[in-house]
């Protein structure tokens, strides 16, 4: 399989808002999409890493009609890895024993790490609601910004590791719930036509959205907030969407 990893984007620097990045990168990704559409085979797989990754991936999706929508994904594995690591520390358990962690929505501070369906060593995780909402969720959401605050730069090594994990899942499949940004089609009442992180089953032959997950009510509200953010981002770049 041929892969294109879209790492390059105007970087987010200290004090910069995500909204500042959107239009700066939209034109870049449209021009890259046009070249990709012209020269790449239809089964090429494209992973968008450069932020705002979901909306950059949306621009690629709209401007590469020769490539399957399912082959264009945005990186959410970094958030997935962070969420598992934070829960691992809390429970003093190995990361590999944590299953069914979900990340919903955008790769931004509105992302929704959801551990209400998590299992550790085949047992349902049962943690205090206050810790989940006051500590766990904000810690995952803000981790990228914290690293920029400390280093003045984003987390390159962690992102590289997450890209490797993302490709490994696409190539070899996974026995766990995966978090990948894909083009939404109305699942869980999410607006169609957004690049949205959804819970997936992934095999070496493809992926499918896991249906009928019971979403805790407070998580559902957060998912709607992330959806709203992605709709606003889509509106900002609508001139780049044919």
Language-model segments: residues:
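NAD(P)H-binding glycine-rich loop region in Rossmannoid oxidoreductase-like domains
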Residues: 1-22
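C-terminal substrate-binding/catalytic lobe of Rossmann-fold NAD(P)-dependent dehydrogenases
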Residues: 64-70, 79-242
């Amino acid at each position: 399989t041929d892969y294109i990893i879209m790492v390059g984007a105007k970087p987010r620097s200290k004090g910069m808002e995500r909204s500042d990045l959107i239009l700066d990168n939209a034109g870049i990704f449209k021009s890259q999409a046009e070249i990709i559409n012209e020269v790449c085979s239809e089964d090429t797989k494209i992973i968008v890493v450069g932020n705002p990754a979901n909306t950059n991936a949306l621009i690629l999706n709209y401007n590469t009609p020769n490539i399957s929508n399912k082959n264009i994904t945005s990186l959410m594995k970094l958030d997935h890895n962070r969420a598992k690591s934070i829960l691992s520390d809390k429970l003093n358990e190995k990361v590999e024993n944590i299953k069914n962690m979900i990340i919903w929505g955008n790769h931004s501070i509105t992302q929704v790490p959801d551990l209400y369906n998590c299992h550790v060593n085949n047992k349902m995780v049962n943690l205090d609601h206050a810790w989940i909402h006051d500590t766990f969720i904000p810690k995952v959401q803000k981790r990228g910004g914290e690293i920029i605050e400390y280093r003045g730069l984003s987390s390159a090594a962690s992102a590289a590791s997450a890209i490797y994990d993302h490709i490994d899942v696409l190539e070899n499949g996974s026995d766990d719930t995966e978090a990948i940004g894909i083009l939404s089609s109305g699942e869980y009442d999410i607006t169609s036509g957004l690049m949205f992180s959804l819970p997936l089953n992934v095999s070496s032959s493809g992926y499918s959205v896991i249906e009928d997950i019971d979403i805790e009510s407070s998580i559902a509200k957060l998912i709607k907030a992330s959806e709203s953010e992605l709709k606003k981002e889509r509106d900002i770049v609508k001139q780049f969407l044919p």
